[in-house]
UniProtKB/Swiss-Prot annotation:
InterPro entries: NUP37, WD40/YVTN_repeat-like_dom_sf, WD40_repeat_dom_sf, WD40_rpt. GO terms for cellular component: cytosol; nuclear pore; nuclear pore outer ring; nucleus. It comes from Schizosaccharomyces pombe (strain 972 / ATCC 24843) (Fission yeast). Its main location: cytoplasm. The keyword Nucleotidyltransferase does not apply. The keyword Cytoplasm applies. Disulfide bonds: none annotated. GO terms for biological process: nucleocytoplasmic transport. Keywords: Cytoplasm, Nucleus, Repeat, WD repeat. This is Uncharacterized WD repeat-containing protein C4F10.18. The lineage of its organism: Eukaryota, Fungi, Dikarya, Ascomycota, Taphrinomycotina. It is found in: Cytoplasm; Nucleus. WD repeats lie at residues 137-179, 182-222. It comes from the Eukaryota.
Length: 391
């Protein structure tokens, strides 16, 4: 499988900071969000109409005005799409209506939950101030928690920042409930586990990778102010002794990001800024006796990665695992505008990178696994991946 030069490019008249697909919502999986200097612009991907083409194109739908640069974004799985709704006068509205739930980070270091009907903001929770982060916020993710009768009980937002803190923001009917968890260095990435929203993976700049269950200490969180609480981490890994055995550079072990891999989060992929990457399989050979899904307790032999390697270039943007094939991930060199596809289980599988000729800001996979959205300083591109079939 290789990246193709078959690309669709859409010029932007804003400065982008981040991009993400609405991949968790079945009805909105073709929506792409660009966070930029004045807000969030939503695009819809559709099949290209050119005869013989199998690519996607983008159509701008609307812009949600936040009034500040939007630096990080995450869609809730509660996002939905509907048609032929009636307005207040009983008339049929033929325009599509997107009900969106977006967690975002703005330049003032606030974390926000924005609920919209198309571009109209219905509700906006601004979470910050004295009870929020006291420095730059580096990543954010959102998860929906359902009750026993399959109703949405609350939405949970996780954020990490340069203040060496992970904050869990629970949005309930009674208002936001916050809890802070100290880290040993600045937090650079955070992600809920796909198969269990109670569990989080957190990456720290010093190479620490931590997993914990945020529900284990709820009694300490039942207050309206952020309080640093002691929560038992389920698992801690560290890239420092692993990558320094083959790299002497001081930046070798500085983590770029860490992500779950597999649709159930059965593995971990960590990318260092030097280009070194490491992969852990939490459930090797489906032997669930080696590790408990609920407690994440590992034996000593599991602390070492199952496989590791290095990309063709350093990466400040980290790794983006393929949504369907857990052996593959994409990485990028932001300054030189390079995108590379790597197979973790094929030795020397480094593919020839695509050179875009412009700095890369962010990139992410479409849920179908055949297209990569790439935000550059002046445009957004959809690059088709040759060799992967679409769903």
């Amino acid at each position: 499988m290789t990246l193709s030069s078959n690309q669709y490019q859409l010029p932007l008249n804003v400065r982008p900071y981040t991009t993400t697909w609405c991949s968790q919502s079945p009805s909105c999986s073709n929506l792409l969000a660009i966070g930029h200097d004045t807000g969030i612009t939503i695009y819809c991907a559709s099949e290209e109409q050119t005869p013989g083409s199998t690519g996607l194109t983008l159509q701008e739908l609307f812009t949600i005005q936040t009034g500040l640069p939007t630096l990080h974004l995450s869609f809730s799985s509660s996002c939905s799409y509907s048609e032929n709704l009636h307005d207040g006068d009983g008339n049929v509205n033929s325009s599509p209506v997107y009900s969106l739930f977006l967690a975002c980070v703005c330049q003032d270091n606030t974390v926000r939950l924005i609920i919209t009907k198309n571009e109209t903001i219905i509700t906006q929770h601004v979470l910050g101030g004295k009870s929020g982060h006291h420095n730059f916020v580096n990543d954010i993710d959102i998860a929906d928690v359902y009750s026993a009768d399959n109703r949405l009980a609350e939405q949970v937002i996780a954020s990490v920042g340069d203040d060496c803190t992970l904050i869990i923001w629970r949005l309930t009917d009674e208002g936001p409930i916050l809890a802070g968890y100290p880290l040993s260095s600045p937090g650079i990435s955070v992600q809920f586990r796909p198969s269990n929203p109670n569990q989080l993976i957190v990456g720290e700049r010093n190479g620490n990778i931590r997993i914990f269950d945020w529900t284990l200490n709820l009694s300490a969180e039942e207050n309206s102010q952020t309080e640093l609480v002691k929560n038992p981490w389920l698992l801690t890994l560290n890239t420092l002794p692993l990558v320094n055995t083959c790299h002497s550079s001081g930046i070798a072990s500085s983590l770029a990001n860490v992500r779950w891999i597999g649709s159930d989060g059965s593995g971990i992929l960590a990318m260092c800024k030097s280009g070194a990457w490491l992969r852990w399989n939490l459930f090797a050979n489906n032997d669930y006796n080696e590790i408990s899904d609920s407690t994440m307790k590992l034996g000593p032999k599991n602390l070492l990665p199952n496989v590791q390697g290095i990309s063709l270039f350093p990466s400040l943007l980290g790794a983006c695992p393929h949504p369907r094939y857990m052996d593959y991930f994409a990485t990028a060199h932001s300054q030189h505008g390079l995108i590379q596809l790597i197979n973790t289980y094929e030795k020397d599988s480094n593919s020839i990178p695509i050179q875009l000729g412009m700095p890369i800001v962010d990139f992410c996979w479409h849920q179908d696994g055949s297209h990569l959205a790439i935000a550059t300083e002046g445009s957004v591109l959809l690059t088709r991946l040759m060799g992967f079939t679409r769903l």
